[in-house]
Amino acid sequence: FEVAALCGCGIPTGYGSSTRSGDVRPGEDVAIVGVGGVGTAALQGAVIAGARNIFAIDPVEWKREQALKFGATHAFASVEEAAMSIAEITHGHMCHKVIVTVGEVHGKDVDTWMGITAKAGTCVLTGMGNMMESDVTLNLAMLTLLQKNLQGSIFGGANPKLDIPNLLSMYKLGKLNIADMITRQYRLDQINEGYQDMLDGKNIRGVIRYTDEDH
């Protein structure tokens, strides 16, 4: 049940951000910005889609270590730190796809993410922004001249009736590692601890387990 619980939202959102909204193709270079639960699912989506280099970017060292275990080829603490290495590894082309799965998106960061997006590449915004914020900073000349794309994504562009059964089938076949994304399980009376661990970056995914005593 704990594996199925993750497939209600986080797994299809992340996986679909790479495979549907991002349409990652074999041989492409991909950056995943934020490798928590949704980002790790996006990372696995990029791996399964056949990405060549996968750059995991997250300020939490433990999450970067986990990302390498899930298939990332490189890991960095920030986009600024990653940019020079991405340019060197891709011979200046940068990333065909940039999947942004941070907890909260801010307009001031969009141009930074677009900066590691390749010519004619796509930056997918899966992380949510503030509904009251309308201050995206973007170099429009570079957007036009380099034909870059900025793509919003909800639920990874997934079809729940089709994709959730498919994801569970991939898990059963050993192609999608969902179980190892569950860092810790909590009782209902530990729910506040679970939220705090999430905010502190201690979990890839935490699961609240209900028992008969909770009814």
Residue ranges of model-derived segments:
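Mid-domain Rossmann-like dinucleotide-binding core that forms the NAD(H)/NADP(H) cofactor-binding site
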Residues: 1-84
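Glycine-rich cofactor phosphate-binding loops and adjacent beta1-alpha1 units
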Residues: 22-25, 64-149, 214-215
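Structural detector of well-ordered beta-strand residues that form the stable sheet scaffold
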Residues: 31, 55, 122-124, 151, ...
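A local structural motif
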Residues: 51-52, 94, 175-180
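Residues in the short beta-alpha loop(s) of Rossmann-like NAD(P)-binding domains
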Residues: 60, 129, 156
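Conserved beta-strand scaffold positions in the cores of enzyme catalytic domains, especially
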Residues: 75, 150-152, 181, 185
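C-terminal hydrophobic helical "lid"/dimerization subdomain
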Residues: 81, 111-115, 157-215
